[in-house]
Each structure stands twice: as C-alpha cells, then as structure tokens.
C-alpha cells in the first residue's frame, strides 16, 4: 500500500510504502480489538475502592445482651453486617484489576487496529512533526489545512518539545512517541497521523517480533 507524504502546510513531500502485513489486513477482528481494549482499561483502573471490614469498624465489640433468656437472637457484636453502622459483608477491597493477555494477541490487535484505519482511509503520513516555535494557533492553522480535527499523532522516536507544547491545548489531539503506540488510543481517535520515522519504526517493531 502506498500513501502520499505531506508536510504540515499540506504540501506533498513524497510517498511511502506501508507493509500490507501490518496495514493491509482485510478481515478486521473486532473481538481481538475488544479484548485488548478491555485489557488496557483494566490495567488503568486504580482499584482503590475499600470498605471497612469487621475489625476496622468503630463500633463496640461488647456483647449486646445476655446469651439466654431474652428470646432474641444470640448476637455478640455491634460490628456485624446486619446492624446499622456495622461492617459491610463481602465488600470491595483494594486490588489490581489487571489480567494477563498473550503478547501475540496484543501484537495481532495492533496490526488489526492499524489496518482498520488504513481500510477506512484515516491514515495521514507527515514528513516530520517538528516546530520552530511552540505556537498553538499556528499548529491549529496547519491542522485545519490538512483537515485534522480528531487525531492521534505518532511523532517519532521522541516527541518534539515545541510540537508537544503547541498540541497539548488543542482539543481531541493526542501526541505520542513511537513507543506509546497502542490499540486503545488508535481506535479512540478518528485519524491516525504517522511521521515517516514512525512508519519505519512500526515496520521494524513487527519485523523484530516475527524474527523472534
């Protein structure tokens, strides 16, 4: 697959070949994408919800009344879950919501996510993502020229500092380095913008995995 390379002013700056094994998958596996997005979001959950168990509730542990002779149940503590102000039975505690997912599934999902963007014509290739000044207004004007309203920009091995500063105040624009490329962020934005360096890095990344 061949795409035109453009610059930030919208002018053509050559062309680039995209690997069909990464960007040309025809049958997109939505089930694999769903599994990986769920895995990513589960890892992000803080898991800090917490209730007080019986030994943490600030209530008396003294026996409420004598064991026999009252006709009532044999309660022994106000901390029991059935009483107002008592503990919560089987409530949430601090834990990790993360779970394991095979690396091959994660790699497959990334290929399918990239292919879905290519299939819908939602990939733009930039020559570079570098600015001389961190001016948000200037970058927004450039994005308007190339029709970017909602996009993920993969800017190369490192994100240019001026580009990062200029882009962070623009709504619905995310900027990540090559290492930050992930399924969730690819899918949540309408357009995927790759620099030429990013395209080469993606191809090299999957070539290394296949060699391994």
Swiss-Prot record:
Family: Belongs to the universal ribosomal protein uL4 family.
Organism encoding this protein: Caulobacter sp. (strain K31)
Subunit relationships: Part of the 50S ribosomal subunit.
Classification via Pfam families: Ribosomal_L4
Key words, A-Z: Ribonucleoprotein, Ribosomal protein, RNA-binding, rRNA-binding
HAMAP family, per database record: Ribosomal_uL4_B (MF_01328_B)
GO molecular function: rRNA binding; structural constituent of ribosome
Function: One of the primary rRNA binding proteins, this protein initially binds near the 5'-end of the 23S rRNA. It is important during the early stages of 50S assembly. It makes multiple contacts with different domains of the 23S rRNA in the assembled 50S subunit and ribosome. Forms part of the polypeptide exit tunnel.
Name this protein carries in UniProt: Large ribosomal subunit protein uL4
One annotated Gene Ontology cellular component of this protein: ribosome
Biological processes annotated in GO: translation
Lineage, broadest ranks: Bacteria, Pseudomonadati, Pseudomonadota, Alphaproteobacteria, Caulobacterales
């Amino acid at each position: 697959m061949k795409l035109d390379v453009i610059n930030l002013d919208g002018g053509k700056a050559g062309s680039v070949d995209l690997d069909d094994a990464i960007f040309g998958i025809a049958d997109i596996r939505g089930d694999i994408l769903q599994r990986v997005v769920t895995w990513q979001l589960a890892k992000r959950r803080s898991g800090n919800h917490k209730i007080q168990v019986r030994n943490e509730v600030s209530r008396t542990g003294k026996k409420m009344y004598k064991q026999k002779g009252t006709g009532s149940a044999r309660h022994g503590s106000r901390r029991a879950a059935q009483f107002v102000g008592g503990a919560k039975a089987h409530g949430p505690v601090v834990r990790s919501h993360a779970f394991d997912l095979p690396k091959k599934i994660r790699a497959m999902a990334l290929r399918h996510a990239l292919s879905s963007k290519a299939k819908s014509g939602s990939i733009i290739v930039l020559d570079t993502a570098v600015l001389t000044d961190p001016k948000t207004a200037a970058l927004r004007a450039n994005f308007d020229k190339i029709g970017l309203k909602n996009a993920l920009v993969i800017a190369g091995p490192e994100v240019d500092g001026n580009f990062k500063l200029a882009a962070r105040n623009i709504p619905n624009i995310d900027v990540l380095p090559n290492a930050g490329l992930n399924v969730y962020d690819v899918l949540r934005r309408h357009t995927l913008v790759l620099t030429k360096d990013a395209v080469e890095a993606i191809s090299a990344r999957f070539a290394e995995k296949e060699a391994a």
